[in-house]
Amino acid sequence: MKSDPMSRKCFLGVFPSDVLPSKTICYPSCLIANVDSQYLPGSHWVAFYFTALGNGEFFDSYGNPPDFYSDDFTRFISRGSQNKWTYNSTPLQGEFSNVCGEYAIFFLQHRNRGMPLTQIVNIFTKNTLHNDRMVWTFCKKRFPRIGDMETQHRTAVNQMAKKKQPGRHTDSYNAYIDF
């Protein structure tokens, strides 16, 4: 995100759910957060965006509201929003996919170029495999350091099959900060 001229101006960084910025938010601003605390490896990435007017937006590729994951998220977006906040309620990502970080990047890249949240969500179809490939391809073209989607997907499915858990994965918190 730092390498993108449209994002670097307002990108605050990448954070675990329990270490979100406590200082006053400047507007516009954005960040990527993991739903896990700093003591866990990380399981799912989401994005926050605060408009120039002080409205807050929460983007989750599974379409969940902030309080689904953490009271910290709800407090953060409420504190950071001067007026109101909203979230996307449409599931976009495949259940066994592990490209949630790419969805967060996709959202912020488009949002930082002025595209509204609803318009970004409308880019996607009901075909989650198509959506997953689209965001991965988008990110891979712009940020070549992102790994191979097929390998990531196979690894995630194998790990989930062993644990019998829904689609989640682990990443390091700094994975997306230099893009």
Language model feature labels by segment:
Residues 25-113:
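Cysteine protease-like catalytic core of ubiquitin/ubiquitin-like
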Residues 81-156:
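C-terminal folded domains that constitute the principal catalytic or ligand-binding module
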Residues 7-14, 80-87, 178:
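Generic preference for hydrophobic/aromatic residues in regular secondary structure cores
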Residues 143-179:
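Disordered regulatory segments flanking catalytic cores
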